[in-house]
């Protein structure tokens, strides 16, 4: 389909040229309101959520420049890879135009270029619903509930409509509600069986070889509950952490690899105060949002070998790693009240904390006082109330 474009745009006649155009009675493109939206950081403390302006279809028709295969179907995941915006929908993976974000249509209906969109089907004998993706040096990893796939370029160069292919990697079951994660040179995903969960790692080899898949939770078989519902990692610290939200437990796997094999592997279970809402490892620190009775708190602990978190700073230079058990310094509840206040009427010292004291937890104070003063009582206070007793250590 072409249209005549005159050199004289006013008279629109005379000399000119023919330009590709869109066929009549053909949809010009995608409905922005039903497509993935964006959450944009518009300021230090502000975000804006809204639709994205996807590029319109400018040439051809449904045969020569078809709609992407996700139209009329549910989109399961979005990603960016090889300078393309990608989408997972049912058993298809769709890449937009290269270096043209949010464009899923070819620029020309007459000629195919390397930048044109790519639409591939995994073609399996089993029902497949692609749920997650992870990048790798050998290509793009695709995950579904029962199979794993790899997208790569046959000529080992850039991904194009002519060079992109999909191959089946493995047939392991995966909990699709827990996104897989990248641990440096390997990937990790959770498999759930009745009564407990398993944690697998996958390491890719050459394109013609099968991946190496290892059940790293085999040493603690049936120890990880089937209620874990999140996964976070720290590749520099060789840490994988499973989160059991709405409980008090974190399950941590830590290892040491010399470049060839794991020389050390260990599993640890942490019990935290309150119920965990979410947990993430960012910048070598575990940050946990938890609910303590009727309020939410944020705690963090560093994972590096030499703790640098400052819990207490005194003349004795005592420092410690800020933990996840609600450790805090005294905090002023308001501008007119000090963080530590002596109550002369009741002969006690009130130490204010930035959260409401937890009724079923024992408070522990770390005091740097002369030996003669030990044994004195103190109460931890907040705006809503304070503990009746605190234990000194």
Residue ranges and their predicted role:
Residues 2-4, 16, 94-96, 290, ...:
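Short, surface-exposed terminal/edge motifs of secreted or surface/virion proteins that either
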Residues 195-198, 202-393:
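Beta-sheet repeat architectures centered on beta-propellers
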Residues 1-69:
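Long, charge-dense tracts
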């Amino acid at each position: 389909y072409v249209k005549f474009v005159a050199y004289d745009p006013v008279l629109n006649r005379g000399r000119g040229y023919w330009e590709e155009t869109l066929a009549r009675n053909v949809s010009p493109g995608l409905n922005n309101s039903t497509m993935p939206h964006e959450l944009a950081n518009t300021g230090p403390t502000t975000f804006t959520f809204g639709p994205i302006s996807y590029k319109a279809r400018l040439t051809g028709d449904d045969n020569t420049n078809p709609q992407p295969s996700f139209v009329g179907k549910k989109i399961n995941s979005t990603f960016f890879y090889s300078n393309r915006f990608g989408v997972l929908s049912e058993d298809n993976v769709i890449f937009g135009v290269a270096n043209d974000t949010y464009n899923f249509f070819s620029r020309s209906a007459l000629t195919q270029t390397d930048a044109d969109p790519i639409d591939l089907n995994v073609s399996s004998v089993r029902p497949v619903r692609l749920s997650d993706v992870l990048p790798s040096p050998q290509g793009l990893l695709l995950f579904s509930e029962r199979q794993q796939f790899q997208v790569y370029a046959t000529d080992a160069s850039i991904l194009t409509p002519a060079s992109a292919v999909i191959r089946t990697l493995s047939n392991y079951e995966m909990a699709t509600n827990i996104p897989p994660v990248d641990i440096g040179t390997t990937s990790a995903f959770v498999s759930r069986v009745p009564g407990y969960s398993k944690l697998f790692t996958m390491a890719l080899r050459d394109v013609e070889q099968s991946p190496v898949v290892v059940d790293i939770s085999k040493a603690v078989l049936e120890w990880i509950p089937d209620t874990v519902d999140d996964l976070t990692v720290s590749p520099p610290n060789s840490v994988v952490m499973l989160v059991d939200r709405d409980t008090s437990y974190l399950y941590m796997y830590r290892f040491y690899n010399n470049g060839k094999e794991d020389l050390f592997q260990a599993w640890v279970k942490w019990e935290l105060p309150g119920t965990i809402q979410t947990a993430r490892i960012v910048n070598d620190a575990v940050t946990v949002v938890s609910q303590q009775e009727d309020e939410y708190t944020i705690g963090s602990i560093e994972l590096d070998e030499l703790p640098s978190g400052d819990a207490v700073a005194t003349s004795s230079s005592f420092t410690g790693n800020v933990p996840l058990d609600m450790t805090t310094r005294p905090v002023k509840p308001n501008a007119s009240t000090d963080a530590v206040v002596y109550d002369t009427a009741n002969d006690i010292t009130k130490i204010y904390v930035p959260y409401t004291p937890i009724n079923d937890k024992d408070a522990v104070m770390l005091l740097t006082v002369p030996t003669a003063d030990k044994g004195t009582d103190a109460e931890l206070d907040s705006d809503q109330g304070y503990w009746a007793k605190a234990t000194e250590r």
